[in-house]
Amino acid sequence: ADVFIYVGGESDAWVKTVLDGVDNPNLRVVTLMDCVELLDEETVEGMQTEKHDHDHAADDAEPDEHVWTSPRNAARICQKLADTFAAADSVHAAAYAQRCGDYVEKLNQLDAEFQDVVEHAARKTVVFADRFPLRYFADAYGLDYYAAYPGCADAAEPSAATVAFLIDKVRAEGIPVVFTIELSNGKLADTICEATGAKKLEFATCHNVTAQAFADGATYLQLMERNVQALREALN
């Protein structure tokens, strides 16, 4: 390979061993987490934290790996990739630059749509009856959030305290939408919605897609455009 791309962080700790064994001095490595300003994964009020799939103490903060969830970060990542491809394949450098510019323009438009939704919203709080791998997204648009688990948690059955907290929060703040993320079973969201009358909607983290969505050619931009509409409904 000429270029090796990976996210980085605890989940990709195995990559270093692989790269250490590669005899290719010309290999260019891009770590997505090196492309952006990192934020630590955080635990917010009401969040269940007993189970976690990373080997670190509960009190040890680690960087959130889901850097692509902010369109602004996605633009930075695209620029780094384009620069790396151009360096590895200089004959086509102009083409990489052009395509990157075109795509970043679309990402900037997406960013503007999210900003508009938040600026004209009736509230700035979202509720996720699920894991919350959207720290960068929430930070980019000044959103407050409540969720069942941190972004990298092993989402087992939620505790009664977590369920009760989220139900109370939705009722108290009149939250109209409770989010799940892709490939979630949605059971916790169903419980909260049944208790509060809120509506269950999916918010795509662009981390996973179904086999059918992949076959249909789902893209980051398509998934994020759906998120624009879902967020508009959740904040109004």
Report residues per predicted region:
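Extracytoplasmic metal-acquisition and chelation regions
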Residues: 1-236
